[in-house]
């Protein structure tokens, strides 16, 4: 496996729990449609999803990985190193309370992308020399998509924090269509979104809008 180029511009995060009114199969189909709508990265994050058995989870992850591959979308697994290894995923994304970047790197090797979440200036500074390939910073705004989200950073502080950053980085948390313009002009390499795409009537249009904003100012 050779490490691919990672286009972070339209970074989609979702699992079946983000379509709570749907069955697992229906939710998987909805996620697949969004993956094919023009996103550049898909992160399989299924926290809160209840499976009848573990092999059902693996089957869904494999289906979404295949859809991602066919769409030319990088497939990232959230937190679960063993699943990422079993799938030979393009990458793994971890948080501050998970294993260290160095320990995860030992397990997944150099070929797999390794992303790290940061929520404040101190974490961002430490992350620069952590060995992570890219960072996810947020929440930028208040968000309902994650129950355990940290205090929102705000656009003013985020702008200052990004001056100290040297790594590829995506912003996340409470992003709406109305905030795309101000976010596109502060030095982010991409925007990571959940509800902006899962609740969109036209995901393709939204994905295109995000990409245009980011690449225009990139």
From Swiss-Prot:
Which annotated residues bind Mg(2+)?
Answer: 79, 98
Cofactor(s) recorded in Swiss-Prot or TrEMBL: Mg(2+)
| Entry keyword set | Magnesium, Metal-binding, Thiamine biosynthesis, Transferase
Q: Name a single GO cellular component.
A: cytoplasm
Residues annotated as binding 4-amino-2-methyl-5-(diphosphooxymethyl)pyrimidine are 43-47, 78, 117, 146
Its UniProt entry gives the catalysed reaction(s) as: 2-[(2R,5Z)-2-carboxy-4-methylthiazol-5(2H)-ylidene]ethyl phosphate + 4-amino-2-methyl-5-(diphosphooxymethyl)pyrimidine + 2 H(+) = thiamine phosphate + CO2 + diphosphate; 2-(2-carboxy-4-methylthiazol-5-yl)ethyl phosphate + 4-amino-2-methyl-5-(diphosphooxymethyl)pyrimidine + 2 H(+) = thiamine phosphate + CO2 + diphosphate; 4-methyl-5-(2-phosphooxyethyl)-thiazole + 4-amino-2-methyl-5-(diphosphooxymethyl)pyrimidine + H(+) = thiamine phosphate + diphosphate
Q: How is the cofactor bound?
A: Binds 1 Mg(2+) ion per subunit.
**Record's CDD domains?**
TMP_TenI
Q: What is its EC number?
A: 2.5.1.3
For this entry, list what GO says about its biological process.
thiamine biosynthetic process; thiamine diphosphate biosynthetic process
Q: Which GO terms describe its molecular function?
A: magnesium ion binding; thiamine-phosphate diphosphorylase activity
Q: Which HAMAP family match?
A: TMP_synthase
The name of this protein is Thiamine-phosphate synthase
Q: Which organism is it from?
A: Lactococcus lactis subsp. cremoris (strain MG1363)
Q: Which gene encodes it?
A: thiE
């Amino acid at each position: 496996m050779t490490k691919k180029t990672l286009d972070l511009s339209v970074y989609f995060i979702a699992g079946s729990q983000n379509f709570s009114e749907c069955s697992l199969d229906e939710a998987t189909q909805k996620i697949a449609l969004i993956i094919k709508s023009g996103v550049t990265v898909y992160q399989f994050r299924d926290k809160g999803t209840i499976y009848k058995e573990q092999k059902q989870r693996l089957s869904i992850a494999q289906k979404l990985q295949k859809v991602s591959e066919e769409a030319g979308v990088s497939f990232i697994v959230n937190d679960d190193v063993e699943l990422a290894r079993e799938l030979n995923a393009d990458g793994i994304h971890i948080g501050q309370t998970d294993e260290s970047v160095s320990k995860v790197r030992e397990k997944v090797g150099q070929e797999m992308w390794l992303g790290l979440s940061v929520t404040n200036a101190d974490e961002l500074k430490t992350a620069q020399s952590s060995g992570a390939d890219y960072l996810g910073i947020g929440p930028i705004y208040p968000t309902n998509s994650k129950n355990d989200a940290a205090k929102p950073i705000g656009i003013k502080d985020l702008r200052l924090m990004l001056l100290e950053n040297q790594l590829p980085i995506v912003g996340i948390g409470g992003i709406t269509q109305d905030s795309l313009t101000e976010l596109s002009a502060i030095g982010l390499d991409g925007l990571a979104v959940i509800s902006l795409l899962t609740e969109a009537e036209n995901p393709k249009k939204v994905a295109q809008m995000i990409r245009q904003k980011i690449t225009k100012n990139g």
